[in-house]
Amino acid sequence: YQATDEMMGHQYANVQQRVQSTGIILDKEFNYLRDEWRTASKDSNKIKTFGTNGEYKTNTAGVIDYKYHAYGVAYVHENEDIKLGRGTGWYTGIVHNTFKFKDIGNSKEQMLQAKVGLLKSVPFDVNNSLNWTISGDIFVGRNTMHRKFLVVDEIFNAKSRYYTYGIGVKNEIGKEFRLSEGFTLRPYAALKLEYGRVSKIREKSGEVRLEVKHNDYFSVRPEIGAELGFKHYFGMKALRTTLGVAYENELGRVANGKNKARVAHTDADWFNIRGEKENRRGNVKFDLNVGLDNTRYGVTANIGYDTKGENLRGGLGLRVIF
């Protein structure tokens, strides 16, 4: 049984979840460039290179834990008009994410994802303390899987390449309170909708090659949270720290992808790859960001934790504004 089980392609169980989580890495960077780094000019270009890593743990039988490390570049262009906080912009980024599965053979998957989007920001008062932002983006991805599985006492290999694409829309409304000269508190609420599609996956090389039916996911993710910010200036340099806590819940169909596979190049029946359980308890996430910059260049460090998947993550970045 163990031999058959090893061949069943459990690595494909939550492909949709990994595609989404790779996109979320870029989303975090776009948010960071927009929110954490106030601009002096009305017309700004911000660019950041970043690296991040984390892990995902699960108790669901048939779904494999993994670690990931990603790096990439994110860019945001914003035009602000005369009224503070009102503006439009566009953003783009690319991320390369490597997943290392904690299975017997140490399978590996690599995702390359690019995203481009537009945003609009609307203030509801003079000093932009209450602000609504809507953004929409599209993404495309190219992924490779190297599946390694144990049969009796020998490691077998199978390799595949597949593609992803999708579209997302996010609404966020937030209100900033100034607590003192250095401290601010910003409670916010957001709703992100995303549809993603995964192409047919057909393993080209290796033994016991599988074919996985093309599939999709639909994400409806409300989020509510608050950010405590601190700023301190040393002449031209600024230190900014943000501590954020948020609750989000996935109401769509992402984790349990209901993927189906069969042995490739045969007329064998499709079998179900058992997916992750859809966790409706939601996720509580904690984030600490620290940035040091002069008006043009900056370095950033961040650490975060998600209760869902017990994901402890951390990252570093370099950013430039021009």
Label each PLM-derived region with a short phrase.
Residues 1-177, 300-317:
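Outer membrane beta-barrel translocator domains of Type V secretion systems
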Residues 61-66, 102-109, 144-163, 197-218, ...:
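Solvent-exposed, glycine/polar-rich loop segments of beta-barrel outer-membrane systems
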Residues 113-115, 211-322:
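Outer membrane beta-barrel transmembrane domains
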Residues 185, 192-196:
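Solvent-exposed flexible segments
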Residues 189-192, 244-245:
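A glycine-rich phosphate-binding loop feature that marks nucleotide/adenosyl-phosphate handling sites
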